């Protein structure tokens, strides 16, 4: 489930990839040009797969809680940095797991052709994230029509897991759609606090 939770290129990395993909993947669902990457005040996102994400503005960044069936199953810790928004770590029922160093999720500014990548230690393994802005594309979702940046996100682990996803990102709002298996999960509703 989520941005990075689709097809795997290597079944050998399936176990390590599943947890890491779910953790990192949903973190990539929200995003903006720095002061406009995400809504400054936060907000509530409802997606067509039933996932609800609550983005809360906190000092120096955001907390992003993921709920399904009314229960929080994960919380991402995001912070502002010199280059954009970084994923510091993920809180799960079993504890908090940091990315060392934090991974750049979204740079201050998106432009077609832009590329960024990073490596980190996460849950006792090395992980790598690479993102390319493929262009701007019109996308229709239950929440409306948007001109969104199409991002290709590649995620790999040292245990052989690999995943590639597409997501559709609108600066100032966040991710309005993302690939899940063969289909597209769309934003149904966004509400500001």
Map each language-model feature to its residues.
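Bacterial N-terminal signal peptides
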Residues: 23-32
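Short alpha-helix capping/helix-loop boundary micro-motifs
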Residues: 101-104
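Extracellular attachment/recognition segments
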Residues: 1
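Acidic, serine/threonine-rich low-complexity disordered tracts
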Residues: 34-85, 90-91, 97-98, 108-193
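Bacterial N-terminal signal peptides that target proteins for export
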Residues: 13-24
